[in-house]
Amino acid sequence: MALCLKQVFSKDKTFRPRKRFEPGTQRFELYKKAQASLKSGLDLRSVVRLPPGENIDDWIAVHVVDFFNRINLIYGTMAERCSETSCPVMAGGPRYEYRWQDERQYRRPAKLSAPRYMALLMDWIESLINDEDVFPTRVGVPFPKNFQQVCTKILTRLFRVFVHVYIHHFDSILSMGAEAHVNTCYKHFYYFIREFSLVDQRELEPLREMTERICH
């Protein structure tokens, strides 16, 4: 089972990324730069900092897409253990419950099972990052004025995936030998959102004790 999570971070993934960067684009070059820094062994706090001369929205866009792919893959490796029966409510322990709301099917906050919430979340994020009006890929096309607000909402909801996985499926992480991989992804994500103040501090509370232990 340990091989399963290693495949998540390798070139031969069991679960394919939903979004790729087009070779030859500025976004692709930034992605390569970010990945090279990750593999260089640099401190993750340093890795997330905006490189000199780069556009902050491009940098955020690259990381939002990368985190979406990675977190989607992490959840995918343990999705069979997160069922309507085992997780009838999308929650983070007894104190935190997450309800789903969107502009189509659920206009009011709805209590859903964790797998249903996850499916809606991943589809919602995928639709946003594939929307040229939100995540433009053409040269010279500016980001929308509310781009960072959109990214804040995406990253806040992705953080909730970490909350659910760590609190409700930590045994699965351990049984797959995946703790180090998931922790590294979480630390990378955490340092990034803190560097650019992209997620409200209150949203981070469910994993505060763990974060203090592994990120400080």
From Swiss-Prot:
SMART domains: Mob1_phocein (SM01388)
Residues reported to bind Zn(2+): C82, C87, H164, H169
GO BP, one annotated term: signal transduction
InterPro entries to which the protein is assigned, alphabetical: MOB_kinase_act_fam (IPR005301), MOB_kinase_act_sf (IPR036703)
Signal sequence annotation: none
tRNA processing among keywords: no
One Pfam family here: Mob1_phocein
Key words, A-Z: Metal-binding, Zinc
MF term (GO), any: metal ion binding
Entry GO CC: cytoplasm; nucleus
Disulfide bond found in the keyword field: no
Family of this protein: Belongs to the MOB1/phocein family.
Function: May regulate the activity of kinases.
Record protein name field: MOB kinase activator 3C
Organism: Bos taurus (Bovine)
